[in-house]
């Protein structure tokens, strides 16, 4: 027998739709756009780190770290 707790009773409605899938594509296009934006963000960070992308007044000298 499962233990019934107050927290479990509060969270039960969130699990009521478990296993049900909305028809069609749903939010898949939104997820794709967000993933693409995150990829662009990571590429920009990588280019800044690799000094491939030069930004004025931004020093990327990693030799003398903050002590």
From Swiss-Prot:
Subcellular localization(s) per the UniProt record: Plastid, Chloroplast thylakoid membrane
Entries under Pfam families matching the protein: PsbH
Segments crossing the lipid bilayer: 29-49
InterPro entries referenced in this protein's UniProt entry, alphabetically: PSII_PsbH, PSII_PsbH_sf
Entry keyword Transmembrane: yes
GO MF, one annotated term: phosphate ion binding
Membrane topology listed for this record: Single-pass membrane protein
Keywords of this entry: Chloroplast, Membrane, Photosynthesis, Photosystem II, Plastid, Thylakoid, Transmembrane, Transmembrane helix
An example Gene Ontology biological process: photosynthesis
Gene Ontology cellular-component annotations: chloroplast thylakoid membrane; photosystem II
Keyword Lyase among record annotations: no
Quaternary context: PSII is composed of 1 copy each of membrane proteins PsbA, PsbB, PsbC, PsbD, PsbE, PsbF, PsbH, PsbI, PsbJ, PsbK, PsbL, PsbM, PsbT, PsbX, PsbY, PsbZ, Psb30/Ycf12, at least 3 peripheral proteins of the oxygen-evolving complex and a large number of cofactors. It forms dimeric complexes.
Function text: One of the components of the core complex of photosystem II (PSII), required for its stability and/or assembly. PSII is a light-driven water:plastoquinone oxidoreductase that uses light energy to abstract electrons from H(2)O, generating O(2) and a proton gradient subsequently used for ATP formation. It consists of a core antenna complex that captures photons, and an electron transfer chain that converts photonic excitation into a charge separation.
Family assignment from sequence similarity: Belongs to the PsbH family.
Protein name in the entry: Photosystem II reaction center protein H
Organism: Trieres chinensis
């Amino acid at each position: 027998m499962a233990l019934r707790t107050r927290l479990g009773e509060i969270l039960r409605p969130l699990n009521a739709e478990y296993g049900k899938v909305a028809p069609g594509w749903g939010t898949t296009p939104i997820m794709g756009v967000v993933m693409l934006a995150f990829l662009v963000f990571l590429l920009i960070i990588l280019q800044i780190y690799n000094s491939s992308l030069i930004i004025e007044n931004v020093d990327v000298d990693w030799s003398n770290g903050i002590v």
